[in-house]
Amino acid sequence: MAFKIPQKSSVSIEDPESLFRDLRERTVEGLLAQQADMLRKYMNHVNKNKNTLDIALELPTGSGKTLVGLLIAEWCRRTKQERCVLLCPTKQLVHQVVEQAKEKYGINALDFSGPKNRYSEADKTAFNNCESIGVATYSALFNTKPFFSDVHTLIFDDAHAAENYVSSLWSLEVRRDQDETTFDAIWQIIAPYTTENDQLRYYDQGNEGSLDTSFVNKILTPYLLKCRTALTAAIDNASRDDESSEEYGYRWRWSMIKDHLHACHLYYTSNSILIRPLIAPTKSFLPFQKARQRIYMSATLGEGGDLERIFGRKKIERIPAPGGWDKQGIGRRLKFVDRKSVV
């Protein structure tokens, strides 16, 4: 008896809006006006600009952007047989999006939060075979050995707040309370280029003074270039220490930026020294670079090029928020007020 080889079905769904009406297990009646408007704008833009790789969608808080991202991902998966993943800043948001996708919208999204060695084989197979979309944290993509190394469509939720998550792959932080030896070695190199007040803070903390968290300063780039050779030698020495390298990740983090210090900034506080590039070099990161489409969902886009700087893109096409979105929202906002600011 011959084996029956399953054939991938060819699904013809005109657009993500039509897909929503086809979701039989959803518990919400219909799309909000601004959600439908954004999906139409997205499709119009894609149809007119087929070679556009980077698109930003302005979807303010409470406008229902999660469903928009899920529908685009599911539509690309079904109609183009693409591997699609929606990336969130935190694990809690991943869990929330997956729960909403399944219980409210009838979309089978897979939860890829946590370390990749804990992903189930069934989930990995379903994702790689384009049978389900994935939802994961930014760190699941931006690491040296990501599971998502061959994704067709990347959708970034809360892209305006993603800078630290994206740049973490190319950031080296040395904390005084974790590795005082390396911290002191670097401080002695940069100390001549710091202010007298900052040097006093350093010595006060060293003499068991109270931790001063009220300042963050930066070594001027010309001075950083002057001490680059000594700085490289000090961090090379720390990264050769097997114990420190394994515990704090010096080796692989340092290898990402060692030859590019001229493009980095060095920030310091009383307890931490951070070296990272101003612009994330994502063009050299293949899991990000070779995606067919990258969609950035942001509460605010602006015109200053900040989104391009965060993601290392030369140009990101923008689709502004539909008019009247604030008259029909689904989210609640939580505001924190610093007591010091109102005293």
Language-model features: locations:
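Conserved SAM-binding loop
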Residues: 31, 86-87, 134
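Conserved RecA-like ASCE ATPase "motif II neighborhood" in helicase/translocase motors
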Residues: 120-153, 162-166, 276-280
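Conserved Walker A/P-loop ATP-binding site and its immediately adjacent core
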Residues: 66-105, 110-114, 140
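Conserved pre-motif I regulatory segment
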Residues: 2-58
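Pre-Walker A (Motif I) flank of P-loop NTPase domains
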Residues: 46-57, 82-83, 132, 292-293
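A short beta-strand-to-loop transition that corresponds to the Sensor-1 phosphate-sensing loop
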Residues: 90, 135-140, 158, 297-301
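ATP-binding Walker
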Residues: 63
